[in-house]
């Protein structure tokens, strides 16, 4: 079925507008908002689904609501951050006539405070995800720039051993310092595996189902 003439005419106008270079910076900000919303939903929904049904108690309705709420918050925050970051970058470029490396840091710095500055579980997870990658990247950058010598042997096995040693030590003796979702995961792995009553909660279920 062909589209109505009015709709086809509108699409022609919209597509012509999207191709105009003079509006590219503003339109890039809008598409960044769109991409942030989509990406946030795509990565949060599966994570929330798994974590909620593995570790959260409550009715099916409560679990579904928790999944939707977490997905919405992540999607909305990421969309706002991309919008803010790209908008500030465009403004900096317009004011100064070109871009500088400091522009990226300043725009993201302000966006981070405005969007991800609230201390909650979702923002904590996002920040910790980024922090690990930032530290890796800075280590590689320091080697590339010659600030530190390139290792003569692969340091990854030692790093792995230290990370796993520390996280299990923290879990066993200073658990409250770990992020809640990590506590839940490690409890499932290392403590729930110590308890069973029969074959049902040894192989089929993690914990015995309550009898009716």
Curated annotation (Swiss-Prot):
One Gene Ontology cellular component annotation held by this UniProt entry: peroxisomal membrane
An individual GO BP term: ether lipid metabolic process
Pfam family, one: Tim17
Tissue expression per record: Expressed in normal prostate epithelial cells, and androgen-sensitive prostate adenocarcinoma cells. Not expressed in androgen-insensitive prostate adenocarcinoma cells.
Top-level taxon in the UniProt lineage: Eukaryota
Subcellular compartments: Peroxisome membrane
Bilayer topology: Multi-pass membrane protein
Residues spanning the membrane: 97-117, 153-173
Keywords assigned by UniProt, alphabetized: Glycoprotein, Membrane, Peroxisome, Transmembrane, Transmembrane helix
Glycosylation sites: 57, 206
Main location: membrane
Subunit structure: Interacts with PEX19.
PANTHER family associated with the record: PEROXISOMAL MEMBRANE PROTEIN 4
Family listed: Belongs to the peroxisomal membrane protein PXMP2/4 family.
Name of this chain's protein: Peroxisomal membrane protein 4
């Amino acid at each position: 079925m062909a589209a109505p003439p009015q709709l086809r005419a509108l699409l022609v106008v919209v597509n012509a507008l999207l191709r105009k270079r003079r509006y590219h910076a503003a339109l890039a900000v809008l598409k960044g908002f769109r991409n942030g919303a989509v990406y946030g939903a795509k990565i949060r929904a599966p994570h929330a689904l798994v974590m909620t049904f593995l570790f959260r108690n409550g009715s099916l309705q409560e679990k579904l609501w928790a999944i939707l709420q977490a997905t919405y918050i992540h999607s909305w925050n990421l969309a706002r951050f991309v919008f803010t970051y790209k908008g500030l970058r465009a403004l900096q470029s317009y004011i100064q006539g070109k871009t500088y490396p400091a522009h990226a840091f300043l725009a993201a710095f302000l966006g981070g405070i405005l969007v991800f500055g609230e201390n909650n579980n979702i923002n904590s997870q996002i920040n910790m995800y980024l922090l690990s990658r930032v530290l890796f990247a800075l280590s590689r950058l320091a080697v590339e720039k010659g600030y530190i010598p390139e290792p003569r042997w692969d340091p990854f096995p030692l790093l792995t051993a230290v990370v796993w040693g520390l996280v299990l030590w923290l879990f066993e003796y200073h658990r409250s310092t770990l992020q809640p979702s990590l506590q839940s995961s490690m409890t499932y792995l290392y403590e729930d595996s110590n308890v069973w009553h029969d074959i049902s909660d040894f192989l089929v279920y993690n914990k015995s189902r309550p009898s009716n």
